[in-house]
Amino acid sequence: MKKLILFFIPFICIGQLKFLPKSKGEYVEHTYYSLSYIEDHEQAEWVHYKLNSEMLNGKKVRKRYYIIDKKVSTGSANYFDYTNSGYDRGHLVPAADMKMDSISVIEASYMSNISPQNRNFNGQEWRKLEEHVRFLAKKNEIYVTTGGVLSYGLDSIGTKNKVSVPNLFYKIIYNVKMEKMTAYLMPNKKLESFKNYKVTVDLIEKLTGIDFYHQLEDEMEERLESML
């Protein structure tokens, strides 16, 4: 049994390493997703993971707790940084995408996977976008990259840790089989339909300074990242 576990976990991690963005922060690898943590903002600049229909068939239910991510060398934000802030503890990797097993449920609860989100944003159009991502993943395997646009001068919450409040959040979806890349850039507030916020990956790269999908051949990267 021990040999089986040791074989299975690395198999999952290898899949996660495909198409990682270039990291400006501390790179942290979990079993089902990877992230780049920016200490100055006490959150991830991006999270990146694979999603497909088999993974969405999991039956594990989200546990409503939040855990400090001990893999972050400087220490992640904690639960109390968000208390009475007026902001939701918004998941970057949605808990609904992480129902495969007990490990995935725990990893979705790490505070390194959390960012301050307006309640009307998190519970409405952002949630609908997350549901749309799952709809796409049931058809074809996809890669998803998500984060807040982090910059100096943002408002912050928390007393022990100063957690920046992004004004914008992005989500990039890459369908390898269909050779299609879709991106959304959404203000952190109550919105109309998420479909109105489709942008190019090029624009998100310009705003964040992050190089996404740099592993692709130049011609393909330029073509996919300019898609609208």
Please place each PLM-identified region on the residue numbering.
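Short, surface-exposed beta-strand/loop micro-motifs that present aromatic residues
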Residues: 23-24, 32-37, 168-174
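Viral RNA-dependent RNA polymerase
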Residues: 15-22, 66
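Short, His- and charge-rich active-site/binding loops that engage polyanionic ligands
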Residues: 27-88
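Bacterial Sec-dependent N-terminal signal peptides
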Residues: 1-18
